[in-house]
């Protein structure tokens, strides 16, 4: 396996409660050639203070701050422009990785000559306790498959920037990770490493998982209409497909551990 640099894109807003735990999950990786591109969106809590203290101990952590509160899409775009690595990975500042995540995913991609991949993950609560919910997805996602639904969890995705290039997305407030996968899937199919290598914090105030279905429908429509430039009817159709495949995903790929 090679030893190319991994750039970890970490946007943040008011995650002071969790950010140290998140970064420690990166520090614990068995694959150590990485950099964190930490992009703070003008947090009003102690996020910057905590991350700066960690940066002072490890120069692989690069801390940036937007000039104003600009949202996750702009934060990811800004962070990606600072990335130097061949491999691009994503980790929000309240989620966690298992210690072998980078090593196993890079090996999976190199051995199979994949340029875009994701892994299984599990849900945790606000106290980092496992909820017993595990999420997987299709083994192979084509461009059309990605149009059907946003299968990958953002915290599990990795792509090869030497093949894909710099990705920049439209300034939409939600579903900006989905907008990114749609752009990447126009250049490379996405493949699943069928192993649980990440932990997603579900239900934090302000997170997507805490919003109503009506709100999420509106976000999906804006994704297709504003970010992908589809007409009104096409945007409605694709939003409907997202709803159908979202139900399908819950039935097929979301599993609850037996108590």
Regions found by a protein language model. Give the residues of each.
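Cell-envelope/extracellular polymer assembly enzymes that use nucleotide-activated donors
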Residues: 4-7, 25, 35, 179
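Short, well-formed alpha-helical segments that are part of the catalytic scaffolds
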Residues: 14-28
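Acidic helix N-cap motif at the loop->helix transition within catalytic regions
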Residues: 17-20, 45-53, 96, 100
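A conserved acidic beta->alpha catalytic loop
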Residues: 25, 32, 40-49, 68, ...
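Glycine-rich, basic loop-to-helix element that forms the pyrophosphate-binding segment
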Residues: 66-83, 104
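Conserved nucleotide-sugar donor-binding catalytic segment
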Residues: 81, 137-215, 219-220
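Short aromatic/hydrophobic "clamp" motif used to bind/position activated sugar donors
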Residues: 88
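Conserved donor NDP-sugar-binding/catalytic core segment of glycosyltransferases
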Residues: 100-131
